[in-house]
Amino acid sequence: MEVILLERVAKLGQMGETVKVRPGFARNYLLARGKALRATEANKKRFEDQRAQLEARNLERRTEAQAVAEKLDGQSFVLIRQSGETGVLYGSVSTRDLAEVLTQNGFTVGREQFSLNQPIKTLGLHNVPVVLHPEVEVTVTVNVARSPEEAERQARGESTTVRDELDLEELGLEVGAALAEAGPDAGER
């Protein structure tokens, strides 16, 4: 199905371009969200008549997004979650959680504006891209920690997960002593 794009769509094209897409993508995403029109002769004429208005509206949205981007870019947000000793979360941090945190901090960002490839499942600092407008993208840092104190340590760059560090020489001496006590035939079973 051919559609006329009403705004820039990532990996598809710029505003005003006629592109060929699969019918399901056109119906369920592009047409439903007002990002495109079916490429009929009547719609092509209507688009050309409204092109100046659409470009002005797009420019206005982009300047609003850039104003928000200046405030949001480089910001750091803390999420407190439960996790195991190795730093793996019980559950995950999804785009819904990220949208809630940003909303609580005074930014209006929808969950569809985060471009996470997969949910965050570990403690630590994570850089998350936020698409405020098809032409404006910023990165925020999400600090996932078990407590506010741990979040502060992570922000300073300290490690917070428990790692068992073994001194191999000490371990070797302990194993050797245990074998010596067990007798000469203990290791041959």
From Swiss-Prot:
Coiled coil: none annotated. The gene is rplI. GO terms for cellular component: ribonucleoprotein complex; ribosome. It comes from the Bacteria. InterPro entries: Ribosomal_bL9, Ribosomal_bL9/RNase_H1_N, Ribosomal_bL9_bac/chp, Ribosomal_bL9_C, Ribosomal_bL9_C_sf, Ribosomal_bL9_N, Ribosomal_bL9_N_sf. Keywords: Ribonucleoprotein, Ribosomal protein, RNA-binding, rRNA-binding. GO terms for biological process: translation. It holds the Pfam family Ribosomal_L9_N. This is Large ribosomal subunit protein bL9. Belongs to the bacterial ribosomal protein bL9 family. Binds to the 23S rRNA. One of its GO terms (molecular function) is rRNA binding.
